[in-house]
Amino acid sequence: MTQKRILIANRGEIALRIIRSAKEMDLYTIAVYSDADEDALHTKRADESYYLGGSLPAESYRNLKKLVKAAEETNADLVHPGYGFLAENADFAKAIEKKGITWIGPKPETIKSMGDKIESRKLVSKIGLNPVPGQLKPSRFQREAVKDAESFGYPVALKAAPVSYTHLRAHETVHH
């Protein structure tokens, strides 16, 4: 039986943890890296490293096409996205699966339905579960957000809507 090959589509500590676990499972590990991470520890600990190019995350770790190409060119059997970057990107998961490579993570449909926090709250409510108190529609004005926060109780997590062209997501904890 040939050893399975896992491409880790992430960097740093996240990649190191995945590499350690993968080696415990006797998987051949493939790290990816950008210009900024050429000498990073995860590239040294992996069995193989694949150069993505670019120095910015948008040019490397957030570049779906480059990561799919890396998985193909390295003959990866599995792709682990880690977290952040493209881990919550349904299109990335779908592209990996379309190439016949196993995606380690939620199904693309699940990522899509859970990626929109308001839609995921509605879905959870629809199946009879009680979501954590929160909004069912986004606040357009600060006064709406303050009113809602006061009704839920502090602290609250204030989450910005993703900016579609960058896939950036951010949140802030508000204590009052």
Features from the language model and the residues they span:
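Acidic active-site catalytic centers that drive phospho-/nucleotidyl reactions
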Residues: 80, 84, 159, 172
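ATP-grasp fold ATP-binding core
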Residues: 124, 148-168
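Single conserved hydrophobic/aromatic residue that forms the stacking wall/gate
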Residues: 167-176
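ATP-binding N-terminal substructure of ATP-dependent carboxylate-amine bond-forming enzymes
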Residues: 1-126, 139-147
